[in-house]
């Protein structure tokens, strides 16, 4: 293998680069630096988001490690939208489109300055996916290191029942219950989110950070090491050291195996989704993994995910589907332990590697605490425990668990023999209501309602869904149909966390269903079907459903069906096509800005990851 010229040489070498060198010198670079790889650090610090509020200085930790290892670090920032704060109002329209803004921003900065490599400091819902999309586009050496999960909240009583521990979903559900008075609600919200970090359950942010481990693009422990623990600092330092080593191998030795598209191959994407099925990850991960595959030109689609969901069992249930939180997953050995159980059961592709290990076997032998050969470093890492102190400071505790959770029968991470279900935690549904597919987080659905038949109650916005629930118009047996909330129809594909949490708070969690061409928060549980494709704005059948129509949802049979005749469907379709404004909401009043209209004009449906289609 031959050496490859640094990308940055166009700005650092030769007479024609004198102007660029002059500007680099103004940033502090020297003659010696012009011979080294320039490594971009994409940070996402903001004071708006608890998952990012602690990231202000962590770029310096990465930069120091890069500098010491022989690289030249250069940091920049991206935006970060907090889905929880944006939830329930017009702010949520901006969440998914922000993924594309982040992808573009990273690409613009890296290519605009001809950087040689990239470290992505991400954490919350759209930031990790946005940076992942950019990394797959750029295909230069990259390492992901996230801000880490929040600690779970302390126990409080809600409606006479002790919630131990609490989290964001506890607070939202409590707000919808008439039995929770103002003082009790204050106690819940004050306890739910005690520290910096991404919300403490297996919600979208933590799910995606776990998946970067399985894709091979981050270091072991990235998905589960708490934001508040000193061990998290080590991950930032190692990320800096690792990226310089990847640069040496690629540019110095011509070793293209270190590039993202050669690490995150189709086989790695299959492993990542196998992990997702096993850990009961957020349904949003389907959207983001499909998008990343498209950006990297990887042959991986919704059919691939459907096949995996039939073959991979659910080995872990974490909040909102149980009382376990990410700190418990970490105590159980984190992502390497889940991957280890899948590996021993023959559920993973072995021919993959990562930014830290040459083979999957080597990776899991060293880092899976159940392998029998785990390193002392791994054992020490997974002993990292919460501090139990309210704080926005990272690395502020060195607490240790007294023991690890290696109970494969009833612990936080089970083996295949003791799996919760033989199928995965995420299921792809099809039928006349979802010809191109829909997604349900089966791990969050009580098995007693895996087959559900009900009558449609149609609304055309998330806001209207909230109103009909809080006004007690939703009754047992209803299927709440929320349409025109897809990528183009919203636009922006809003999350339906408030409607589902309010259904749960109203005691209807097992009595009703909610289906939508929008999406759900990673904190959603219950019979909630999202990502219906094609969406209403693109002529999907969901746009023709009327109040009272019978609908069948069957998780076992993977079915989502509107039970009316083909003749009636065609009659309604012809009527819609002949209307003044076909495939648009009839009563909804919503201000849509130019920025959102630009996204809507290019947005594809959820089955393609809601990426933009640019011709």
Curated annotation (Swiss-Prot):
Transmembrane domains' residue ranges: none
InterPro entries according to UniProt: Dihydro-acid_dehy_C, DihydroxyA_deHydtase, DiOHA_6PGluconate_deHydtase_CS, ILV_EDD_C, ILV_EDD_N, IlvD/EDD_N
Annotated Gene Ontology cellular component terms: cytosol
Cofactor binding annotation: Binds 1 [2Fe-2S] cluster per subunit. This cluster acts as a Lewis acid cofactor.
Protein's GO biological process: isoleucine biosynthetic process; L-valine biosynthetic process
Top-tier EC class: lyase
N6-carboxylysine: residues carrying this PTM: 126
Pathway field: Amino-acid biosynthesis; L-isoleucine biosynthesis; L-isoleucine from 2-oxobutanoate: step 3/4; Amino-acid biosynthesis; L-valine biosynthesis; L-valine from pyruvate: step 3/4
Residues binding [2Fe-2S] cluster: 124, 199
Residue numbers binding Mg(2+): 83, 125-126, 495
EC number of this enzyme: 4.2.1.9
KW Membrane (keyword) present: no
Catalysed transformations (reactions): (2R)-2,3-dihydroxy-3-methylbutanoate = 3-methyl-2-oxobutanoate + H2O; (2R,3R)-2,3-dihydroxy-3-methylpentanoate = (S)-3-methyl-2-oxopentanoate + H2O
Family to which the UniProt record says this protein belongs: Belongs to the IlvD/Edd family.
Summary of the function given for this chain in its UniProt record: Functions in the biosynthesis of branched-chain amino acids. Catalyzes the dehydration of (2R,3R)-2,3-dihydroxy-3-methylpentanoate (2,3-dihydroxy-3-methylvalerate) into 2-oxo-3-methylpentanoate (2-oxo-3-methylvalerate) and of (2R)-2,3-dihydroxy-3-methylbutanoate (2,3-dihydroxyisovalerate) into 2-oxo-3-methylbutanoate (2-oxoisovalerate), the penultimate precursor to L-isoleucine and L-valine, respectively.
HAMAP family per the UniProt record, alphabetical: IlvD
Protein name listed in UniProt: Dihydroxy-acid dehydratase
Species whose genome carries this gene: Corynebacterium jeikeium (strain K411)
Lineage of the organism: Bacteria, Bacillati, Actinomycetota, Actinomycetes, Mycobacteriales
């Amino acid at each position: 293998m031959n050496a490859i010229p640094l990308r940055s040489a166009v700005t650092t070498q030769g007479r024609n680069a004198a102007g660029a060198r002059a500007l680099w010198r103004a940033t502090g670079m020297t003659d010696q630096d012009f011979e080294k790889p320039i490594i971009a650090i994409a940070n996402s610090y903001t004071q708006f988001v608890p998952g990012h509020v602690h990231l202000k200085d962590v770029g310096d930790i990465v930069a120091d490690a890069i500098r010491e290892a022989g690289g030249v670090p250069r940091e920049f920032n991206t935006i970060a939208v907090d889905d929880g704060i944006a939830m329930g109002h017009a702010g949520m329209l901006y969440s998914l489109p922000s993924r594309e803004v982040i992808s573009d921003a990273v690409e613009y900065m890296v290519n605009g300055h001809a950087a040689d490599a990239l470290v992505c400091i991400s954490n919350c819902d759209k930031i990790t996916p946005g940076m992942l999309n950019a990394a797959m586009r750029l295909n230069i050496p990259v390492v992901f290191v996230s801000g880490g999960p929040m600690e779970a909240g302390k126990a409080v009583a809600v409606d006479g029942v002790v919630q131990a521990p609490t989290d964001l979903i506890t607070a939202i559900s409590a707000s919808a219950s008439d039995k929770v008075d103002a003082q009790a609600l204050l106690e819940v919200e004050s306890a739910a989110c005690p520290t910096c970090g991404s919300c403490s359950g297996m919600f979208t942010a933590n799910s995606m950070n776990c998946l970067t481990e399985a894709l091979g693009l981050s270091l072991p422990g990235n998905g589960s090491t708490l934001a508040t623990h000193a061990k998290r600092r080590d991950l930032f330092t190692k990320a800096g050291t690792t990226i310089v080593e990847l640069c040496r191998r690629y540019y110095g030795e011509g070793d293209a195996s270190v590039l993202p598209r050669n690490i995150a191959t189709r086989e790695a994407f299959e492993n990542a989704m196998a992990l997702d099925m096993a850990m009961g990850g957020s349904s949003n991960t389907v959207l983001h993994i499909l998008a990343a595959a498209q950006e990297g030109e990887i042959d991986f689609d919704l059919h691939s995910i459907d096949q995996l969901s039939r073959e991979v069992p659910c080995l872990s249930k974490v909040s909102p589907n149980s009382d376990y939180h990410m700190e418990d997953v970490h105590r159980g050995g984190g992502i390497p332990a889940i991957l280890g159980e899948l590996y021993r059961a023959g559920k993973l592709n072995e021919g993959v590697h990562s930014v830290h290990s040459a083979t999957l076997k080597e990776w899991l032998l060293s880092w899976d605490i159940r392998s029998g050969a785990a390193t002392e470093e791994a054992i020490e890492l997974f002993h990292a425990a919460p501090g139990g102190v309210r704080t926005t400071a990272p690395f502020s505790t060195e607490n240790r668990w007294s023991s690890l959770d290696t109970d494969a029968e009833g612990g936080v991470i089970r083996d295949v023999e003791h799996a919760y279900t033989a199928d995965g935690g995420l299921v792809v549904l099809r039928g006349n209501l979802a010809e191109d597919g829909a997604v349900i987080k089966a791990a969050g659905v009580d098995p007693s309602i895996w087959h559900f038949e009900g009558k449609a109650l149609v609304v055309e916005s998330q806001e209207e869904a909230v109103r009909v629930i809080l006004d007690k118009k939703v009754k047992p047996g209803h299927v709440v149909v929320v349409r025109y909330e897809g990528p183009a129809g919203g636009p922006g594909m809003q999350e339906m966390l408030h409607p589902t949490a309010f259904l749960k708070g109203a005691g209807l969690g097992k009595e009703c269903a909610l289906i939508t061409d929008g999406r759900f928060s990673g904190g959603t549980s219950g019979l909630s079907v999202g990502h219906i494709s094609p969406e209403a704005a693109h002529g999907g059948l969901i746009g023709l459903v009327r109040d009272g129509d019978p609908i069948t949802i069957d998780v076992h049979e993977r079915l989502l069906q509107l039970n009316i005749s083909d003749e009636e469907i065609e009659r309604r379709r012809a009527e819609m096509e002949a209307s003044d404004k076909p495939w648009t909401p009839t009563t909804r009043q919503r201000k849509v800005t130019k920025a959102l209209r630009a996204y809507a004009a290019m947005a594809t449906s959820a089955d393609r990851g809601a990426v933009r289609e640019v011709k």
